[in-house]
């Protein structure tokens, strides 16, 4: 199973890509300088790392995602539930709601999701 853990800085960089894709790698380097205060070499190093993880691709200088942000978050969540709760979604939900009271709207939304509506 691939590992979908990103550090805080990697996640900010991934957000930049998702918000601007497809994007030329040179343009991404300029955006990273502006938004993250990164040098070009830092941008390319982190980009390569995220490409090696299978999240993004850089083909002929054009950067785009292999995983949408939503799919990436789903895979992160699955990995977390598997590692922390032995894959038990009910155990995860029980732990979550024991710390946070859900509103009626949230409960109804969860019911719709579970029922596939």
Where are these regions (language model features)?
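Short helix-to-turn junction characteristic of helix-turn-helix DNA-binding domains
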Residues: 17-21
């Amino acid at each position: 199973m691939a590992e979908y853990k990103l550090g805080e800085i990697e996640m900010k960089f991934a957000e930049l890509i998702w918000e601007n894709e497809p994007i030329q790698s040179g343009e991404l380097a300029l955006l990273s300088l502006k938004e993250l205060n990164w040098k070009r070499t830092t941008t390319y190093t982190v980009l390569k790392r995220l490409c090696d993880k299978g999240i993004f691709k850089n083909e002929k200088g054009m950067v785009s995602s292999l995983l949408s942000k939503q799919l990436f978050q789903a895979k992160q969540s699955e990995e977390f539930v598997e590692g922390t709760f032995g894959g038990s979604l009910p155990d995860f939900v029980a732990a979550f709601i024991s710390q946070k009271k859900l509103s009626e709207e949230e409960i109804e939304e969860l019911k719709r999701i579970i029922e596939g509506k």
